């Protein structure tokens, strides 16, 4: 590690919010430490021993700032101006990066106008997905852009379990169409029954409901009701309908042979990142992490039939399973580890 990498500290700032400040003096730390897990946008802070702050009036010690741009872009613009006035070197990144989320933001023209002003003011931009890099350049063709998905503490954490059984469904949002959650359950259940493997699914809260159903959902949980009724037709299915702490969630995932999903949201790919930490394959999905860590298993450019065939092989071929896991760790250490990300971030900020 170079001296510049070792001294580089990044403050990740999100406008609004009430979480205050979380510092990462020990990097990833240990699973179960207080605060948010060092993944997603918190990972950029953790991999540089920096901090994550929320609130428009956050006081920063660090001179290098990654500013998260949410749906209220004029608020982010105001904070960006204040940070620059304070002498900070500010790089921006969109917080909600699914294509349908970005498209929803820009249905409001004022947001697009504010985004263009933000891209004109920022020192640079961080693209967390393949699809966001050209978006920044569309707003400002001269803006320096670094492509760097959220890293994972793959070198620091190994959450593997000696006992593995069944298939873990990676998605949980039934009513977010791009997740293809119901389709994943419908298609994997016959394979699981054929191979005598249990299926675990988390019934997430119902989101993206029509207005009337959103009100009624306070009385009837539509997501849980759907999963309950589906499980009645699939005896091998286990439905978890409660909120799980992050540590318990990862331990639960690690007890399975693989993660299965049909997500087409084009997100950074936390599902694949979680599977990586658990040392199990992630099959399907077109997120950035899925495509980088599990290139031979991801859903990008593959049919559902091909994806199910990969599941079948992983469940029945132990040597193939072990090779896939070994290769995923190797790729992650090279391209999505904390050490690799820290070096890329340091070099990018120095270049601005």
Question: What is each model feature region?
Answer:
Residues 23-31, 154-156, 161-244:
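Conserved catalytic-core segment of nucleotide-activated headgroup transferases in glycan assembly
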Residues 105-125:
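Membrane-proximal helix-turn-helix segments that form the acceptor-binding/catalytic region
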Residues 98, 131, 147-157:
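Short beta-strand->alpha-helix junction loop in the catalytic core
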Residues 260-272, 286-287, 291-293:
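Nucleotide-sugar-dependent
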């Amino acid at each position: 590690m170079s001296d510049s990498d070792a001294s580089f500290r990044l403050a990740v700032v999100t406008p609004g919010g009430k979480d205050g400040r979380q510092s990462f003096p020990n990097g990833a730390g240990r699973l179960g430490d207080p605060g948010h897990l060092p993944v997603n946008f918190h990972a950029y802070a953790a991999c540089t021993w920096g901090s994550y702050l929320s609130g428009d009036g956050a006081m920063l010690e660090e001179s290098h700032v990654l500013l998260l741009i949410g749906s209220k872009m004029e608020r982010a613009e105001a904070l960006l101006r204040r940070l620059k006035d304070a002498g900070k070197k500010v790089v921006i990144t969109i917080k909600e990066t699914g294509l349908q989320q970005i498209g929803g933001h820009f249905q409001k023209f004022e947001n697009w106008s504010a985004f263009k002003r933000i891209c004109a003011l920022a020192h640079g931009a961080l693209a967390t997905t393949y699809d966001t890099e050209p978006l920044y350049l569309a707003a400002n063709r001269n803006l320096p852009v670094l492509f760097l998905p959220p890293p994972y503490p793959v070198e620091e954490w190994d959450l593997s379990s000696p006992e593995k059984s069944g298939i873990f469904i990676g998605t949980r949002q039934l009513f977010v169409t791009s997740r293809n959650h119901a389709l994943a359950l419908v298609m994997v259940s016959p394979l699981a029954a054929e191979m005598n493997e249990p299926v675990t699914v988390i019934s997430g809260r119902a989101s993206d409901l029509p207005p009337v159903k959103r009100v009624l959902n306070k009385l009837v949980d539509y997501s849980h009701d759907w999963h309950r009724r589906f499980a009645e037709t699939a005896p091998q299915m286990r439905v978890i309908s409660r909120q799980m702490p992050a540590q318990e969630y990862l331990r639960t995932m690690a007890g399975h042979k693989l993660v299965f999903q049909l997500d087409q949201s084009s997100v950074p790919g936390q599902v694949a990142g979680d599977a990586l930490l658990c040392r199990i394959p992630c099959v399907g999905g077109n997120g950035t992490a899925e495509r980088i860590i599990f290139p031979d298993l991801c859903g990008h450019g593959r049919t559902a039939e091909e994806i199910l065939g990969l599941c079948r092989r992983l469940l029945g071929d132990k040597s193939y399973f072990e090779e896939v896991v070994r290769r995923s760790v190797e790729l992650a250490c090279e391209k999505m580890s904390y050490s690799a990300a820290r070096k890329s971030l340091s070099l990018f900020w120095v270049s601005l």
